Amino acid sequence: MRKGLRATAARCGLGLGYLLQMLVLPALALLSASGTGSAAQDDDFFHELPETFPSDPPEPLPHFLIEPEEAYIVKNKPVNLYCKASPATQIYFKCNSEWVHQKDHIVDERVDETSGLIVREVSIEISRQQVEELFGPEDYWCQCVAWSSAGTTKSRKAYVRIAYLRKTFEQEPLGKEVSLEQEVLLQCRPPEGIPVAEVEWLKNEDIIDPVEDRNFYITIDHNLIIKQARLSDTANYTCVAKNIVAKRKSTTATVIVYVNGGWSTWTEWSVCNSRCGRGYQKRTRTCTNPAPLNGGAFCEGQSVQKIACTTLCPVDGRWTPWSKWSTCGTECTHWRRRECTAPAPKNGGKDCDGLVLQSKNCTDGLCMQTAPDSDDVALYVGIVIAVIVCLAISVVVALFVYRKNHRDFESDIIDSSALNGGFQPVNIKAARQDLLAVPPDLTSAAAMYRGPVYALHDVSDKIPMTNSPILDPLPNLKIKVYNTSGAVTPQDDLSEFTSKLSPQMTQSLLENEALSLKNQSLARQTDPSCTAFGSFNSLGGHLIVPNSGVSLLIPAGAIPQGRVYEMYVTVHRKETMRPPMDDSQTLLTPVVSCGPPGALLTRPVVLTMHHCADPNTEDWKILLKNQAAQGQWEDVVVVGEENFTTPCYIQLDAEACHILTENLSTYALVGHSTTKAAAKRLKLAIFGPLCCSSLEYSIRVYCLDDTQDALKEILHLERQMGGQLLEEPKALHFKGSTHNLRLSIHDIAHSLWKSKLLAKYQEIPFYHVWSGSQRNLHCTFTLERFSLNTVELVCKLCVRQVEGEGQIFQLNCTVSEEPTGIDLPLLDPANTITTVTGPSAFSIPLPIRQKLCSSLDAPQTRGHDWRMLAHKLNLDRYLNYFATKSSPTGVILDLWEAQNFPDGNLSMLAAVLEEMGRHETVVSLAAEGQY
């Protein structure tokens, strides 16, 4: 009763103040209008009154302490919805836009002792019948409405649904028999239910916890993956779905992990079982490496092998008959002999016993004694003199040969045709200053030799790039011979040639080459055009190597919160950085490093590189190689052979590949041609000098991998050499047919120009082009004009693969001292931005991205989830990679961002979402002004 009075007084507090003002103020006004006699008294009275009267502060809007929550009706049990607000004079429920009758409310009211405000709590009961009687597309919902003197407040809507769980699984797991260490996928789609059923897996009735056993993984689609099947994984697996209504179990799927038997190594051959004559030897092996288990196949083949053997029987030796006695000697003895050859001992037989020689006195003890003969002394003296004379003659001959050889060593080589019949005479001393004059035309070499013009005798129809050896090999030094027409470039070693050179010249060659390589290495290390770096935090960003087709996308959230990484991406041009390859393999991309190595990432980054492979992947086996910390190259991914343990994902587009990885390291894409139809794209670029004041004019034809970085390197190199692009580069499909690349020049005005190429064409060997390891590969055509007044050059250049495709360039050049040639925007000077950080690096606004992830990550019964998004965007080559991520949609959108950088293609993305029925996201994109 006291609580009720206090509540009534609290409600009336504002009203009493208002009544006092309305009643007292008019009365005071009447008193002020009374007679003048009491004016002074009235003034005193008014001075004693305050200007304003106290009143209660204004009451605030109701604030909900408890709002109704979603509820589920299990079987026929009704549910209660609760609502509490303060301050509130009234609270009512509204269900499906209709007010609930007052009698259905259970009201509890009290005054908060701290604030003195009224706290009102209301509850209602919802039955199954009420929910079932509702017709319409929307579920049954209820909402609280609270009143106070300041106004009304509405709570959130609470939906009431009838809970259920179907009995039949939409997809049940199926039993499998798998080999040891094979990946196993058990699929399960739980029954339809409200609320959505939770899924867990049982192994022999024990719950599987992937945290405890990391060999198990449960995907976001409720599928169970056994990463590498073990013998202990042989068990019965059951998918369990449960919610507040019921618990359902699928049929049991039996997984049997079998082991195929393997042979042990063969034992050593046994000794021949026959001690004399024919027999056999045998060796054995057992099917225990490993032994077959769980129905695995037994070893195929024989467990015992036998071979014939023959053991030779031993033969004991026997003496031949004694020979006749010899004549009586000077010592009065004679002798006779016999041999152990009748038969001789063989195969371990016993030797003959006894003496081989037998001697006895032949004069019955009577022997003559004679003095030494003086003739023997004369004989010995003659022999000694003859030996001395022979030694003297030998010394004289040796001195003569030594002097003759010494003169030959210091003399000049007058006729080089003695070394190779295909060249005119050349004097080595006169040509020494030109040994290191010109860089190579076709391939890089350790050192170079350039002499005067050579004429070729018996010129054939073509000059291949790999001639027979001109001279004998020179250890550790490759010397190329060039003529001024650029026609011949042998790669043979020349040891006998350098044996005629002085040691100082050979040392000069080596020192020059070492200095050249050192300078090139230093130049590349300090070349900023190959590297991009920047600082990034959890907001992510983009690193771009300008004009190289190489970039690194760091998604938002990839770097842990609160950390800042100094990241980089660089293109390697050193040949030592290229992975080793066999003859059937080719490098399809530049070698690219991203770092810092070992950085902790919470989601994959996207490394983008241009490649030169033909899009038909059926002719290719494409491998992603990674350089380990020790410098060794390892295969990371084989495209099309991914499994659950594959650490990276590769998306191959027509010209670029995108690598999703969480390991910052050095990568390169290598192609292995499975058929001769496999093709790679080449870029053909033709350069000439900016100005030419001599009669000779050189045209360089580069045959490069069709990547932006390869063309960028050549453009920089030619700019330093004073060259210019004569014609727009063209692409050529080069097949793995082992046929060479042939280059020829045609339609020259012979009255004005002549070609210094003596053959009809030049050829580059197939493997020089196919390997992709020959940097700056090119041929040179040298033309000579008859007069300096000739300033126009018109000709055609043909580049084609033998029995393959080709390209024809129509050249129309102006030869002058002023730079001429076409101006192609191959290197965009405005494209110098290397780092973009934060939200500006991404096309999709962050709120829309979060909305897409929240709505598409959860699996949908109709399949309108991240899997359909990947299918619509053609990113569904290996969905298991995305399924292992916490947000598959986010990783797919990261890959889409890298594909469409920098312009983005939001209109296409909006069209895909429209097809998937995501209208609200399309509206959001339109609101952003992007669609």
Curated annotation (Swiss-Prot):
PTM per Swiss-Prot/TrEMBL: Proteolytically cleaved by caspases during apoptosis. The cleavage does not take place when the receptor is associated with netrin ligand. Its cleavage by caspases is required to induce apoptosis.
Single GO molecular function: netrin receptor activity involved in chemorepulsion
Residue(s) at site: Cleavage: D415, S416
Connected disease: Alzheimer disease: Alzheimer disease is a neurodegenerative disorder characterized by progressive dementia, loss of cognitive abilities, and deposition of fibrillar amyloid proteins as intraneuronal neurofibrillary tangles, extracellular amyloid plaques and vascular amyloid deposits. The major constituents of these plaques are neurotoxic amyloid-beta protein 40 and amyloid-beta protein 42, that are produced by the proteolysis of the transmembrane APP protein. The cytotoxic C-terminal fragments (CTFs) and the caspase-cleaved products, such as C31, are also implicated in neuronal death.
Transmembrane domains' residue ranges: 381-401
Highest taxon listed in the record's lineage: Eukaryota
Modified residues (Phosphotyrosine): Y568
Positions in the Cytoplasmic compartment: 402-931
Organism for this UniProt entry: Homo sapiens (Human)
Tissue specificity field: Mainly expressed in brain. Expressed in temporal lobe cortical neurons and in neurons of the hippocampal pyramidal layer. Also expressed in kidney. Not expressed in developing or adult lung.
Renumbered residue ranges of the record's region Required for netrin-mediated axon repulsion of neuronal growth cones: 402-931
Further information: Down-regulated in multiple cancers including colorectal, breast, ovary, uterus, stomach, lung, or kidney cancers.
BP GO annotations: anterior/posterior axon guidance; apoptotic process; axon guidance; brain development; chemorepulsion of axon; dorsal root ganglion development; ectopic germ cell programmed cell death; positive regulation of apoptotic process
Protein name: Netrin receptor UNC5C
Residue ranges constituting the ZU5 domain according to the UniProt record: 530-673
Residues in Ig-like C2-type domain copies: 161-256
Family in the record: Belongs to the unc-5 family.
InterPro entries: DEATH-like_dom_sf, Death_dom, Death_UNC5C, Ig-like_dom, Ig-like_dom_sf, Ig-like_fold, Ig_I-set, Ig_sub
Subunit-level organization: Interacts with DCC (via cytoplasmic domain). Interacts (tyrosine phosphorylated form) with PTPN11. Interacts (via extracellular domain) with FLRT3 (via extracellular domain). Interacts (via Ig-like C2-type domain) with DSCAM (via extracellular domain). Interacts (via death domain) with DAPK1. Interacts (via cytoplasmic domain) with TUBB3; this interaction is decreased by NTN1/Netrin-1.
Region: Interaction with DCC, residue numbers: 694-712
